[in-house]
UniProtKB/Swiss-Prot annotation:
Molecular function via GO: iron ion binding; N(6)-L-threonylcarbamoyladenine synthase activity
Function: Required for the formation of a threonylcarbamoyl group on adenosine at position 37 (t(6)A37) in tRNAs that read codons beginning with adenine. Is involved in the transfer of the threonylcarbamoyl moiety of threonylcarbamoyl-AMP (TC-AMP) to the N6 group of A37, together with TsaE and TsaB. TsaD likely plays a direct catalytic role in this reaction.
GO cellular component, one term: cytoplasm
Protein name, UniProt field: tRNA N6-adenosine threonylcarbamoyltransferase
Native source species: Campylobacter jejuni subsp. jejuni serotype O:2 (strain ATCC 700819 / NCTC 11168)
Gene: tsaD
Length: 335
């Protein structure tokens, strides 16, 4: 029976392929190859290198799941938003595969995929708030009863995850910065450094991390010799202030929207400090908290495959001749 959907994810620096049963939501195959070590020496993602590594990794993974090809009913691929050259690597492969196997092609918005990471093995729930925090995005969404999405808040500049990467780079700690900063903060012996919470007295429902990032830079410049203890102290102050900022704005949003269900997705949602605070916030407002599994917080093809299951039912197919690359499109209005 042809009931399997193969999905490809290559929006940034993770190459991933997954195969899901559209009837049972059972994962038949999932593989992910990270490029973190390859980019770490540059302190961030190099697009051209990412594209080359995708072109090497994706064919290898396809060979590993070839046994399932005879049961495929569709090919899905991330087409927006992301790095152009990275997206194109996955799209080109998806189009080739769809054409060769004579299967429908399903483009999937990467951010929508993250939302589906909450529902990998179950039907999607509606009427809930969602915090999406990653290396490229920071936003709060309202998933309404009619499956429409309303953007409640987004960042005016840097994202939550991006700010961790940049602070780590300032202190020559490596890439990616999220886990490095989090682990360093846990080892802080001194806690005398503090930073102002961004937009603390603003009623605007928005995030901003550029000012905090600059405050960290100025603090680093005060120290001629940045020893490990000082780095840990700065990491602790930065992480807590960044989390304070997220929680401050979420508190305002909860007061306005009275969510009974709240989901958290994206690579940066793996931060344990943030997760703990979110649990406390939802307890305070008597809301059910749904967290994406740690294994599937970061970019992966299984969330794309899961989103494609619902897209398949709606027949959201495109021609392999159609230009579906949309690297900057963050506007998605429905699930």
């Amino acid at each position: 029976m042809k009931n399997l959907i193969l999905a490809i994810e290559s929006s940034c620096d993770d190459s991933s392929i997954a195969i899901i049963d559209k009837n049972t939501l059972e994962c038949k195959f999932h593989k992910k190859i990270s490029q973190e070590l390859d980019h770490s020496i540059y302190g961030g993602v190099v697009p051209e290198l990412a594209a080359r590594l995708h072109s090497e990794a994706l064919p290898k993974m396809l060979k590993q799941c070839k046994e399932h090809f005879k049961n495929l009913c569709a090919i899905a691929v991330t087409n927006e938003p992301g790095l152009s050259v990275s997206l194109l690597s996955g799209i080109s492969m998806a189009k080739t595969l769809a054409s060769a196997l004579n299967l429908p092609l399903i483009p999937i918005n990467h951010l929508k995929g993250h939302i589906y990471s909450l529902f990998l093995e179950e039907k999607i729930s509606l009427d809930m708030g969602i915090l999406l925090v990653s290396g490229g995005h920071t936003m709060v969404l309202y998933l309404k009863d009619d499956a429409s999405l309303e953007l409640l808040a987004s960042t005016n500049d840097d994202s939550f995850g991006e700010s961790f990467d940049k602070v780590a780079k300032m202190m020559n700690l490596g890439y990616p910065g999220g886990v490095i900063i989090e682990n360093l903060a846990k080892n802080a012996k001194l806690k005398n450094i503090s930073f102002n919470t961004p937009l603390k007295h603003s009623k605007e429902l928005a995030f901003s991390f550029s000012g905090l990032k600059n405050a960290v830079r100025l603090e680093i410049l005060k120290h001629e010799n940045l020893n490990e203890d000082t780095k840990a102290e700065i990491a602790y102050a930065f992480e807590n202030t960044a989390c304070d900022h997220i929680m401050d704005k979420l508190e305002k949003i909860f007061n306005l929207y009275k969510f009974k269900n709240f989901g958290v997705v994206g690579g940066a949602s793996a931060n344990l400090n943030l997760r703990s605070r979110l649990q406390n916030l939802c307890q305070k407002y008597n809301a059910n908290l749904k967290l994406a599994p740690l294994k599937f917080c970061s970019d992966n093809a299984l969330m794309i495959a899961r989103a494609a299951v619902d897209a398949y039912e709606k027949k959201e197919f495109v021609s392999v001749e159609e230009d579906i690359l949309s690297p900057k499109n963050k506007n998605f209005s429905r699930i």
